[in-house]
Amino acid sequence: MGLRRFKPTSPARRQMIIPDFSEITKKEPEKSLIAPLKKTGGRNSYGRVTVRFRGGGHKRRYRIIDFKRDKVGIPARVVSIEYDPNRTARIALLVYADGEKRYILAPQGLNVGDTVLNGPDAEIKPGNALPLENIPVGTIVHNVEFIPGKGGQIARSAGTSCQLMAKEGKYALLRMPSGELRKVPVKCYATIGVVGNEDHKNEVDGKAGRVRWKGRKPHVRGVAMNPVDHPHGGGEGRGKGHHPQSPWGQLAKGYKTRRGKKASDKLIVRRRNG
């Protein structure tokens, strides 16, 4: 995995930093593991905009990823590392000993030809998935479940990971990518290692067109709108006239937006902001 820079033949080329895709070994996805992906343009089922500044972008097909890692005790061989347009991480195509094919998130250090295993008896090496109760304290993991059997929900983006800090009774203590310390049931599965494509954070789109290819539209400022469209709109000049707000009147700049009481609050040992 590396990054490409370009000769400054234009201002966009001067700034652009993109991956070199040297780790990709196969261009076309496995046909049995793809599904259609319909674009929403940021609209819900009523046709109303629920996420602003979304629309267009290159056509994609969804890759069906195995986040559950529930095929226990059967070894699988890595046959390819592939690009996935729906996520920042790369994905690895596995072929199990019984012939079944599945995609998983490709961790750092996983190469074509390697063998991976799911289950309590798996070795502690990148790509193997085990219950937290069978993983040594201090191990770096990703694709961590919150609810046993539901599938991994945490640390799935490029370069992210959690660290197993302690185990006590029914719960394991994990340090999240945000720095939060959180209890997770020891029966939950996690995959060993750090998610690959760690240089993703250093990529620079370089030009507006590359952002449009991803389906993101220009982010219009509130002060550039009319009063009917935004609390910051209208007026003479560019003044907001009052505290910064969202388009729906919720205060920005430090106002706490987290829901008051959540069932998982009792599992948070230390918040990410202390």
Curated annotation (Swiss-Prot):
Quick one: where's region Disordered?
Answer: 222-274
Which residue windows are transmembrane per the record? none
What biological-process terms (Gene Ontology) are attached? Answer: cytoplasmic translation
| GO CC term, one of those recorded | large ribosomal subunit
Named from the GO MF annotations, one term is: transferase activity
Query: What's in the keyword line of the UniProt record?
Result: Ribonucleoprotein, Ribosomal protein, RNA-binding, rRNA-binding
Sum up the protein's function in the record's words: One of the primary rRNA binding proteins. Required for association of the 30S and 50S subunits to form the 70S ribosome, for tRNA binding and peptide bond formation. It has been suggested to have peptidyltransferase activity; this is somewhat controversial. Makes several contacts with the 16S rRNA in the 70S ribosome.
Similarity field: Belongs to the universal ribosomal protein uL2 family.
Q: Extract the PANTHER family matched here.
A: LARGE RIBOSOMAL SUBUNIT PROTEIN UL2M, RIBOSOMAL PROTEIN L2
How is this protein named in the record? Large ribosomal subunit protein uL2
Q: What is the lineage of its organism?
A: Bacteria, Thermotogati, Thermotogota, Thermotogae, Thermotogales
UniProt lists the gene as rplB
